[in-house]
Amino acid sequence: MSKHIGAQMLEFTQNGDERGYLVVLEGMQDVPFDIKRIFYIYGSDSTVVRGQHANRRTKFVLINVAGQCKVKVKDGKGNEAVFVLNRPHTGIYLPEMMWKDMYDFSEDSVLLCLASEHYDSAEYIRDYAQYEKEVNQ
């Protein structure tokens, strides 16, 4: 597991044989929070940028279960890192208050997103200047 500015790459156990592979994810075991929401992103063109926000309370684990994409994370203090998600048994953990941009999606990309909280639009910060202000207060 590598860690960058609060984001962490996670590697999940693969169980496999001649029939293929199985990856099991359980909240508070393989994922560092109870999973309250699951969604996935697919059909995004390679020029599309998704995300472009931070969450005040929600933590995420992002896993590209098919294809690949890149995730750029920023901490609002001048630090950033780029992760390539291209293996279905790896993911990235994003704590709350982490700015995220997902981009460079392959045609077959399916990005699975596990969230620690139910959806609440009020906890999203969609303006980067506002995000920096909140992080640095």
Identify the function of each model-found stretch.
Residues 1-90, 107-108, 113-114, 119-137:
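Non-catalytic, conserved peripheral segments adjacent to functional cores
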Residues 87-91, 97-104:
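Well-ordered alpha/beta subsegment
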